[in-house]
Amino acid sequence: MNIALLKSKIHRASVTEARLDYVGSISIDEKLLQASGILEYEKVQVVNINNGARFETYTIATQEEGVVCLNGATARLAEVGDKVIIMSYADFNEEEAKTFKPKVVFVDENNTATKITNYEKHGSIF
């Protein structure tokens, strides 16, 4: 049996752009992708903290510092300045799942990584 677990998370990133006339996806600063362990073209779930919207798309790396840009139809699901959580998941067998820890990247208002952990605590942003 395989179990899907949180693999990587970029927490409370600010949407910097929303481009409706684009093929699709979410463009993310390549430094954030590297810090989180999310790969380019990897499927991600995005949760908009401001309006509760949840959607899936794939990532595109950009060299533009601090960029988190919703492309195509997903541009309708957030406004510039909205806070989002970007998550990827992976399947593990039961033994792997018992010891696996996700990579969680916390960012500031400029989408610069401020803290990287491998855990989350109930009731705490950090």
Curated annotation (Swiss-Prot):
InterPro entries: Asp_de-COase-like_dom_sf, Asp_decarbox. Binds 1 pyruvoyl group covalently per subunit. GO terms for molecular function: aspartate 1-decarboxylase activity. It is an enzyme of class 4 (lyase). It catalyses: L-aspartate + H(+) = beta-alanine + CO2. It comes from the Bacteria. Its EC number is 4.1.1.11. SUPFAM superfamilies: ADC-like. Substrate binds at residues 57, 72-74. It holds the Pfam family Asp_decarbox. One of its GO terms (biological process) is pantothenate biosynthetic process. The active site is at residues 25, 58. The keyword rRNA processing does not apply. It is found in: Cytoplasm. The modification Pyruvic acid (Ser) is found at residue 25. Is synthesized initially as an inactive proenzyme, which is activated by self-cleavage at a specific serine bond to produce a beta-subunit with a hydroxyl group at its C-terminus and an alpha-subunit with a pyruvoyl group at its N-terminus. Pathway: Cofactor biosynthesis; (R)-pantothenate biosynthesis; beta-alanine from L-aspartate: step 1/1. GO terms for cellular component: cytosol. CDD domains: Asp_decarbox (cd06919). Its cofactor is pyruvate. Keywords: Autocatalytic cleavage, Cytoplasm, Decarboxylase, Lyase, Pantothenate biosynthesis, Pyruvate, Schiff base, Zymogen. Its main location: cytoplasm. Belongs to the PanD family. Heterooctamer of four alpha and four beta subunits. NCBIfam families: panD. This is Aspartate 1-decarboxylase. It comes from Campylobacter jejuni subsp. doylei (strain ATCC BAA-1458 / RM4099 / 269.97).
